């Protein structure tokens, strides 16, 4: 889960799985983007005090964008939109949801304003219905729902409003303000996401298998794809231990890299300064450069 009250946050190409509650929850933020993240296999019947709790995430914020993410194999909260004051101008677009259990998206109370546009829904073995959204129970949320695709269900694809549980007349006819993205039609987003989502630079065997099952429409792990323990998907891998580069000031940037770019290997404070680029901190430049290797 993300900390509250943060601003100007971006989460990109993250793979996250095996939580005892939500796998990826972030809200009460301002200017947030979550993109190209692979969110899979929360643990349903695990050690949560409330019992079964295999949930995808609580997503929200003020001026928050969620695009090109994949939620797969969660019983519910695919996602849940946060029901707190300030959940406004949330744009949920070009995401893929696969093999939900009893609920896809819901929430957004306390006067939430949410766009759900151009997402791709693929029912799996555990999916109990073809709904897109259950509006918030307090009846104060407002939702623009359009251009979403429900694979295998032309009725829902052609008229999204048929797949919304809305007894409060919460649907609106025009989208709320949002920051534009490089938007795809849903089926194109689906194929792009399967190719690029998560830690795609070097995928582990677990991520590869999850994506294979999404593509094939399978749910062989656990009960129809809903799991209770990491052991059901192979368990924690044994990772090779590498040799870390020397980092004298423990600022996250190796000495050899700092010297190459004219930084001080004995000064930890330069990690958060803008010596190398006016828009990005030095440690961001270092981390982004790792992708070039």
Where would I find each of the regions flagged by the language model?
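Short clusters of hydrophobic/aromatic residues that line enzyme substrate/ligand-binding pockets
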Residues: 57, 132-135, 265
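Solvent-exposed, acidic/flexible segments
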Residues: 4, 17, 27, 85, ...
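Extracellular beta-rich repeat passengers
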Residues: 83-231
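Extracellular calcium-associated, cysteine-rich motifs in secreted modular proteins
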Residues: 231-293
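Non-transmembrane alpha-helical segments in soluble domains
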Residues: 36, 67-68, 211, 254, ...
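Short acidic, glycine/proline-rich loop/turn micro-motifs
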Residues: 49-51, 268-269
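Right-handed parallel beta-helix
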Residues: 5-18, 30-48, 54-81, 87-102, ...
